[in-house]
């Protein structure tokens, strides 16, 4: 089946990313609903709204960390399915809420589900992708996040045309997510498991069968055999390293470095400020004098711009220009846009100067464009690529949970308060971080992983599987069977407990 099957598989798995985008974006329009604000006796800039969004991010942090355990023990497929089932329960609770507690519990469950899927979907995609197209395949995750934002915005926009006396304004958008959640939960039963996970569990014949299904084009049998040999030898070498629990990720120098890269790329993504805009852009537009249905209409257009840009980037550019250059470009460009946004806002505090308001909307839009040309797809691709197989589940869980969702929880809680209290000065926090911390870190320390197999990336960080594998590992042909010993593949067995850290 080859490339078309791989793309279809990755796109369907990215339904989990769609739910990530939908659940992240749905509250943008829900908090515009007068019926919702009246029903829960709150305002847009209250701590209650911050709590609704921060409980979602907090749940996602927990889900991401838990996902590391389920991915390693039960597989990539199971983790995605678990997230989909939990999302379904969260959708039911939110849409049927009779009080604030039900909304908060529903948001925690939705966040938990999104946390599971946000770290498992990119890993699953990276492990089924061909090295030449991995950027595009994993980039589909960010594409579906964007589509989720689009759908949530237009579903919300349409629902807000219901009378202010109707709870349909907010119950229907919260219920809609149950449809893709159910589709994903059932559909993943028919999808194959990651071949790398199958090799790790000793299911060698099944792993080879799936590799052929994913990549065979009628002429590349030798390449598939070489890829299989490399995957198998690498995983056997890494299994020779005693790696129980989570602490080992911090004790082995190479793994610690690679984990840090994964965490930092997620932190830097959050510090662009784009998710703050995603959650609270309607508040920002209100400050610019754009109110009523015009407000949600502008938000809907905003949420279309990013995914369109992202699609163009992942199809035509990502696997050509690499990872580092787009992220450095995005850091500089987003910072300039944030500074310009703050400057215009500072001269239009009452939102009555139309020209300044238009300029403010323009720079908010440019932020999502620059983000979609850089951190949007690159952060997920880079995180999935830099993790070694032996800690890939736990490593991606930790990077997503701490780097992405813990930071998101903080900004979700404080942003509505900050936008009300310090207004335009809030944007300078993100610009300063980007220019003073993100840019030099990427320039001096991040590696270029483009066009390399997941096993070849080991060499960028000091050697294959902690330097235990020979350079010609791809040409070796380990014997089949679970009874193999490490020394039969030419691998030196090392116990981490006796290594100098």
Model-based region annotation:
Residues 1-216, 223, 229, 233-501:
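Alpha-helical transmembrane bundle of multi-pass membrane proteins
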């Amino acid at each position: 089946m080859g490339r078309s099957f791989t793309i279809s598989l990755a796109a369907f798995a990215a339904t989990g990313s769609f739910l990530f985008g939908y659940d992240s974006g749905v509250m943008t329009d829900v908090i515009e609903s007068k019926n919702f604000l009246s029903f829960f006796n709150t305002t847009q800039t209250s701590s209650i709204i911050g709590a609704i969004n921060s409980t979602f991010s907090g749940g996602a942090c927990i889900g991401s960390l838990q996902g590391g355990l389920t991915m390693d023990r039960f597989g990539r497929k199971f983790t995605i399915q678990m997230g989909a089932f939990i999302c379904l329960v969260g959708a039911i609770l939110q849409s049927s809420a009779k009080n604030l507690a039900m909304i908060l519990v529903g948001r925690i469950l939705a966040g938990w589900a999104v946390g599971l899927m946000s770290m498992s979907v990119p890993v699953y995609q990276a492990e089924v992708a061909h090295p030449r197209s991995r950027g595009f395949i994993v980039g589909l995750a960010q594409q579906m996040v964007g589509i989720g934002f689009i759908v949530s915005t237009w579903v919300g926009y349409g629902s807000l045309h219901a009378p202010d006396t109707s709870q349909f304004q907010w119950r229907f958008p919260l219920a809609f997510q149950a449809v893709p959640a159910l589709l994903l939960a059932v559909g993943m039963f028919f999808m194959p498991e990651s071949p790398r996970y199958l090799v790790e569990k000793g299911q060698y014949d099944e792993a080879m069968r799936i590799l052929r299904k994913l990549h065979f084009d009628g002429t590349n049998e030798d390449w598939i055999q070489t890829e299989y040999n490399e995957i198998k030898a690498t995983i056997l070498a890494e299994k020779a390293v005693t790696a129980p629990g989570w602490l080992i990720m911090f004790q082995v120098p190479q793994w610690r470095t690679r984990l840090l890269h994964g965490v930092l790329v997620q932190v830097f993504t959050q510090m662009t400020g784009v998710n703050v805009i995603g959650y609270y852009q309607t508040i920002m537009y209100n400050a610019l004098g754009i109110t009523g249905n015009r407000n949600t209409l502008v938000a809907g257009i905003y949420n279309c711009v990013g995914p369109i840009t992202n699609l163009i980037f992942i199809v035509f550019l990502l696997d050509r220009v690499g990872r580092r250059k787009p992220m450095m470009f995005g850091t500089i460009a987003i910072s300039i846009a944030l500074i310009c946004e703050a400057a215009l806002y500072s001269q239009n505090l009452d939102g009555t100067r139309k020209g300044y308001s238009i300029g403010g909307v323009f720079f908010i839009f440019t932020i999502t464009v620059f983000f979609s040309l850089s951190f949007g797809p690159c952060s997920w691709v880079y995180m999935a690529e830099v993790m070694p197989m032996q800690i890939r589940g736990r490593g991606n869980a930790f990077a997503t949970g701490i780097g992405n969702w813990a930071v998101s929880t903080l900004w979700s809680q404080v942003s509505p308060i900050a936008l009300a209290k310090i207004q335009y000065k809030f944007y300078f926090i993100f610009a300063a971080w980007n220019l003073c911390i993100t840019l030099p870190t990427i320039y001096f320390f991040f590696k270029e992983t483009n066009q390399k197999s997941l096993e070849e990336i080991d060499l960028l960080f000091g050697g294959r599987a902690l330097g235990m594998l020979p350079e010609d590992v791809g040409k070796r042909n380990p014997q089949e069977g679970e009874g193999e010993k490490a020394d039969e593949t030419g691998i030196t067995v090392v116990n981490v407990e006796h290594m100098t850290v």
